[in-house]
Amino acid sequence: MATGQKPHTDIHARLQSLGDWSARFAQTPDAAALAPFAEAFSLAYRDAFPPEDGVADAQTLQALPAEPPLALKLARGTDARQLQLKLYGRGQPASLSRVLPLLENIGFTVESVQPYAIAPDYWLQQYTLTLPAAIAPEAVESRLADAFRRIWTDATDSDRLNALLLVTTLDIGEIAVLRALGKYIIQAGAPYNYEQICAALNANPDAAAALIAAFHAKMRPQAGDATAAFSELQNRLQQVQSAEHEAILRWYFDLLTALLRTNYYQKDANGQPKNRLAFKFAARDIPGLPKPKPLYEIWVYSPKVEGVHLRGGKVARGGLRWSDRHADFRTEVLGLVKAQMVKNAIIVPVGSKGGFVVKNPPADRDAFMEAGKACYRTFIRGLLDLTDNLVEGKIVPPADTVRHDEDDPYLVVAADKGTAKFSDIANQIAAEYRFWLGDAFASGGSAGYDHKGIGITARGAWESVKRHFRLLGKNIQQDDTFTAIGIGDMSGDVFGNGMLLSANTRLLAAFNHLHIFIDPNPDPAASLAERERLFRLPRSTWADYNPALISQGGGVFARSDKTIAISPEMKAAFDIQEDSLPPTELISRLLKAPVDLIWNGGIGTYIKASDETHAQVGDRANDALRINGRDVRAKIIGEGGNLGMTQRGRIEAAQNGVRLNTDAIDNSGGVNCSDHEVNIKILLNQAIEAGELDLAARNALLAEMTDSVAEHVLRQNYLQPQTLSLALARRENLDDYARLMQQLEAEDRLDRAIENLPDDASLGKRRDASDNLTAPELAVLLAYSKMWLYDHLLASNLPDAPYHQQNLRHYFPAQLAEKYSKYMATHRLHREITSTWLTNDLVNRLGIAATWRASQASGDLPALVNHYTIARETSDAAALWQEIEAQDNRVPATLQIELELRLRDHLERSIEALARHGVSGDDLEATISQLQKRITALLATAHAQRGQSRPRDKAAWQNLGLPEALAARLAALPLQFEALNTILAAKDDSSLEEDWQQTLTRLAGQGMFQ
């Protein structure tokens, strides 16, 4: 045979064989419907598979779904532990680098793979797989196909937990539940990593299956009694051999026990599982969670985003943060919600906070932002998936959702770090869900109040700054310049607005993450104008500051510089001796500089306590420049930003003479403004539904009320710091504060260690040293006192009393009271608003410990509110407060404090008398009217017979600048109390005059009328 003859024969034989293959393909059943595939298979395919397989494969290819165009089939291999997997597709063939890890995570060992091309653009890949144990293809094929599709489309994850597919009957969706709960366990602070959690589940497949069985029994609609399933789960857990595995699995058990709702059974518009899992827990029922535990917690999980939302109560509000703390963002959110609970003591909702992470953020900036928005949308949808709706005033629960809790329709969100521009996105999703709150769901959107435009947060914090300066005898708005160090830049809301609020600001230095601005001897007028220019300039930085306006020795320096030369002017202004410093050290020196004010409007924690470590602070980016509270030499700190100091750092600074409050006190204006916006929109939605108002008119009305809303908000920013000033002036109240804390602890409302409040032994030392609590400590206790009173009022029928419901008109702007007051009583939160208004009014005026003292006297906090209301109205206290506060910068601030305390003492004596004589609050209007008339008559008699009361007090106050009429009214308060007490003690009207004459004689003998 000639050379080359054999190959010719082989080719001929192969062509003959292929022709036979095509003929046999055409003769098979259904071949007519598959005609396009008759010649589509490659030579390699025809060599490997008979025509009958070609028909079956062609049918599979023809039936490929549009998205993704994938399918798979399983067949037995050469032995019981081997399977043949065919993967079908269209377009670009599947990458082995993606397929192999997917299969290996499921538990397969891939022995070989053979690809085949099929015209025009189909492909097939055959994998030879071995298994740890024998398994029938039909037992796993459909679950494997579903898993492959969902992993391929990024609808679920590919990791070791998917090995449960082969050793249990769980499907990929059920495994996703275990994965999501496992990731929550890590965020909850359990001492396990994800590898340990996967190992525990994979090593105990029966327990894993029992977990899912219990999940279905409890949460599947129409599932019935879950008792048996949980009993079986307990049995399975007792059989686990490894102590670590059992501990991990018991975390799962605890989560299922505390689980209230899930969206697992909900479907999207196409009838498919949703692209996220959401779980709502009764957090206080999860033993392993760190304190403080919120009331409710929602965990949202998907392959692209993880998020958590913590709520302190059923009516709660707070921002959603785009976190960069992937490993422990729940810890970050827990710290924020603790602060939010304290901050929200002045508003209707209690505190909530949410946070989410983008799990695989792209490097490109624009793509990064789009990924963040997409993850935010998923997070918001996960929250709304588990939230009840209101339709025509009736609760409508989420579809296909078992609820193990009460109706829960109130969910509002706000902006936070990273989500400042996302409110409209949230409201669009609320509209998609037809959520009852509409665009009140996320405040600050395009039809809401622009916090930066109003400057509400900075203006609120500035009320604290002005008060601190008044107590130092300075009027910074009119006469007195002051030096300041700033944290932030002029493009920021809080920093920028704050540095425009006084023409007397001498900003010596400021820093942000990019620059250090130094102006050792600024001209107040010129620098104010330049700061205003930067504030108006989009995306400005300190580098945009006109260098010609910076004083000698100053400049703008990059934080990336190796060192910064210290000019003589800088040395003098900031008490620096070195000739040069690294940027981080220069910032530390600025924070320690002897200035009047540190104004914090930035992000980061810059001051801690000397006994705290940087790791405890949890802000690694600022470790190099952070200082201790005892090293602060500024006279005042204004906390426009959040978390600028640790609480222990605040306390240490206060104990070393720095005047400050807390961030929750200073910057509460933002959350208060948002709450007003939400409640106004809820009110006006009623008018819209009644046809009295359309959306355009509502938006116009919202804009018209901007100044009025700001005025309402700033009122609390004035009153709360005033309450702290009064508390600091009364050191003798320390025992009352101690007993209040003990009471709150007894009711499991307060954990002193968490809130950095002193224990009884520490309080004893302060008492011996004649020390008080510091302002930061009092600020926390103020919030807890308000929360305690609020809860008692809300649980009573007091908010429904007609007299107290009149306070709704005080809460809302006057424009609403004039035209839409009829909707106030039917407002969804009318009881909460009334309780909040009463709580703020009473605690701000009577002080932090008033609630405890009243509870000891009568044990009835609602009765305290009624008696306080009677005392306030019969004393005309509101007018007196207004006149005292009008004396700001006219008389010494210490005199104002003295007068406020005199008025408070009068009210407390009156309340005690009303309680002692059992005065009812059933008809407040009649009681107040009757007492007012009688008191007026008795005072008229006294003045006619005896003249003015306490003339020496009146004269002393006038000498300090107090108006004569106000001095006279305040001097008459003791006589006014005696009139009230005489009326209450009188047996009847006939004896009242005689009793009053006896009282006047006694008072004259005591020098009342000298």
Show where each model-derived region lies.
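Short glycine-rich or small-residue beta-strand-to-loop segments that form or flank ligand, phosphate
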Residues: 1-2, 84-88, 165-166, 179-183, ...
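Non-catalytic interaction/regulatory segments
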Residues: 1-108, 112-304, 316-323, 367-371, ...
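Extended active-site and interfacial segments that coordinate phosphate-rich ligands
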Residues: 4-6, 10, 105-110, 114, ...
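Long, K/E/R/D-enriched contiguous segments that form extended
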Residues: 33-36, 227, 231, 235, ...
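Generic recognition of flexible, low-complexity loop/linker segments
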Residues: 69-76, 86-88, 98-100, 116, ...
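Hydrophobic/aromatic-rich, well-ordered segments within soluble, folded domains that form packed cores
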Residues: 95-104, 108, 175-184, 340-356, ...
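Short coil/turn segments at secondary-structure boundaries
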Residues: 159-165, 177, 190-199, 225-228, ...
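Non-transmembrane, aqueous-exposed alpha-helical and coiled segments at domain scale
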Residues: 362-363, 372-377, 384-406, 419-1010
